């Protein structure tokens, strides 16, 4: 059991999510052009992760970076096993309003290896192709080309129609911190039901197995959790 940033995290080590799995039927190999695209899309001026490699190094290395990272990503793609360094994060609590000593008054950012972001972006792009087919038009959160204005326009249209036909209308606004409360095993089941290839789900599953993190509230970091 570990207490991180005021929230208790408990993992049952007999849970299936802890065991690395391998799928025999693989999706098509990762291309060098995909690695190049991922490198070019990584935001610069970001703090390095635990490996200390700055993101600004990649443009300097150019084609050499593409070739090396393509080899690493392809190895992960085939074996479905991630380097442990890519499973490590550094949590930095950022105070919001109120007492900064209260964990609930802080938001957390996670620093990860910039090299790992290449593989993550490629995996995200492949998953997005399947997810976009399943999501309804009203789902705007975390979708490219959609945002608050898109939802406001939808609400305006709904209100207009309700008034036109003299219908009652009710709105329920919920703001819940649910991103870290998702049951992973249920998530894998849902992805399978959505038609996501087992290979992609396996990569995600093995990424989240044996995750490690340190908390850096100031100049010093805690031991790995």
Give a label for each model feature.
Residues 1-104, 110, 114-118, 135:
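Surface-exposed loop/turn segments and immediately adjacent short secondary-structure elements
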Residues 176-225:
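Conserved polymerase palm-domain catalytic core
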Residues 87-102, 129-131, 213-225:
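Active-site-adjacent bridging/hinge elements
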Residues 45-53, 101-111, 149-192:
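Conserved catalytic palm subdomain of right-hand nucleotidyl-transferase polymerases, strongest
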Residues 120-121, 128-142, 224:
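Electropositive, glycine- and tryptophan-enriched low-complexity nucleic-acid-binding patches
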